[in-house]
Each structure stands twice: as structure tokens, then as C-alpha cells.
Amino acid sequence: MGEHQNVKLNRTVKAAVLTVSDTRDFDTDKGGQCVRQLLQADDVEVSDAHYTIVKDEKVAITTQVKKWLEEDIDVIITTGGTGIAQRDVTIEAVKPLLTKEIEGFGELFRYLSYVEDVGTRALLSRAVAGTVNNKLIFSIPGSTGAVKLALEKLIKPELNHLIHELTK
């Protein structure tokens, strides 16, 4: 891969945040709130209409993601439902929608999780990223540790570059 300078976009990046949980609400959703705050700190727009919570149900997840794919959004980040529990179905809902999977994201996320956060428990993560036409989707665990790691180490440093690549 060639060298890439930091890409500056001539517009505001727009994101949507979807928390997948049977137990969280807007007051207790630390993971989704953390994603929103970290994005907004980098001037990424996350409007109230583009932050919501759905149950751990494949149809609910797919319906919300498809709705946002029709809107003026650059990136969708889902939190929660990426493990191996019976109710963890985010990956099953999101992966079939992807036009292209960004395999390196999941690989790097699990590696960094192992080294910097949860040790061998990283093998339980099925975090995934990919594209749907000219939009990005990242599905990450809902813990604030996982959110910070994914956003600070992987997503935010490459977000503008990824969007630039999708739109050229």
C-alpha cells in the first residue's frame, strides 16, 4: 500500500450510532454514549435522530441499519451483540448487508483487545467492519473499554481516509 497523508474532507462527516441491547436504555447506555462523545470530539456529526437503541433481535438491527443506509450518513457504528451468547446476533444482522468486508478491522481489533484490554477474552469478539456502497459500518462490542479501543486506535485515525476512498 502506498503512503497516504492525513486526508482532510471538505465537509462534515455524519455518523449514526446503534446500540444493541436487551437491557440498556438511553440513561444506562455507556457504550453508545461513549461512541457518540468520541466522534463528536472530532467534529463528527451524530444527531439525536442518529443515535438509538434496539433489542438483540436480528430483524430490529437489520431494519434500523437499512433505514440509515438510505439516509445522508457516512458511517454507522453498532455497539453490542458481537459476542457468542445466544442473543448476540448483531454480526448475523450486519454481515449479510456488507458489499465489502474490511477484514483487517476485526483482526486488528482482536489483536489490540488481547494486548491492551482483555487478554485471551478477545477471542470471544466477532467485531466486524465493511462497506455498503459508499457507507461504512463498524460493529463493535458495547463495553466502554472496547469502544474506546476501537474508536481511538482504529476508527477515528482512518475515518476520513476510508470515506475518501469510498467516494473517489
UniProtKB/Swiss-Prot annotation:
GO terms for cellular component: cytosol
PROSITE patterns associated with the record: MOCF_BIOSYNTHESIS_1 (PS01078)
Pfam families in the cross-refs: MoCF_biosynth
Signal peptide: none
UniProt keyword tRNA-binding present: no
SUPFAM superfamilies reported for this sequence: Molybdenum cofactor biosynthesis proteins
Pathway(s) of this molecule: Cofactor biosynthesis; molybdopterin biosynthesis
Keywords: Molybdenum cofactor biosynthesis
GO biological process: Mo-molybdopterin cofactor biosynthetic process
Protein origin, superkingdom: Bacteria
UniProt cross-references to PANTHER family, sorted A to Z: MOLYBDENUM COFACTOR BIOSYNTHESIS PROTEIN B
Biological role: May be involved in the biosynthesis of molybdopterin.
Protein family (similarity comment): Belongs to the MoaB/Mog family.
Name of the protein described by the UniProt record: Molybdenum cofactor biosynthesis protein B
